[in-house]
């Protein structure tokens, strides 16, 4: 995505408002380490496929080892997004997600960060006292084996 990359806004999430989100700006945040125990726990609870829950079977998979569920990866992304990008004082929720893709597997030991591009900011047509911020979020993987 185009835009100037910065590691922060002028304001922290504790004092960030609609006007602080500038269309075209790019921000990088993170990092969070993917822990094997958490991959196994999440897989067992929510996505019990062999390459998420069984290290030996996962070695024989196309991935060559244990990988995090895409939903686990999405949850880790959401943690970074919530901690660093979303306003803590003015966020009223989200109208949804346009697209979600998993392009690369995430392995235990990888470190994730996010790059967020502000695609659009606009006033709500139905509630003009509120703003809508459309963002493009990428998960960056350091240590990726794939």
Q: Which residue stretches match the model-derived regions?
A:
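HotDog/MaoC-like acyl-thioester-processing domains
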Residues: 1-22, 102-146
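Hot-dog-fold acyl-thioester-processing enzymes
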Residues: 2-96
